Amino acid sequence: MLYFKVNEGQLGAFKALCERFVAQTRKEPGCVHYAFSFDGDAVHCREGYDNAAALLAHLDNVGPILQEALKIAAITRLEVHAPAAELAELREPLAGLKPAFFAVEGGFRR
């Protein structure tokens, strides 16, 4: 889960980037859900992937769009929820984004 704060006056431009994020991500077979929610200038990207490899492929896929987004918004929080073994694969590659890692230890997925 990724949270942004959009710079003043940039919400329209950020929403246009969100449309590009969605179009690009729709092509990824390992993405199981992906959507943006808005509360004023606060934006939440809810996303889920089959595994760590799919998440890393996503970051490669949307990297250029993310760089554009970071010119008009800041990441305020990044959470990664996954089984511990998957988190182990993500800690080093995601370190620069300073995520909070949560080990999933129960529940179900359909």
Model-derived features: positions:
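Short S/T/G/P-rich N-terminal loop/turn motif that feeds into the first structured element of a domain
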Residues: 1-44, 50-60, 71-110
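A short, acidic, amphipathic alpha-helical segment used as a generic capping/interface helix at domain edges
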Residues: 63-67
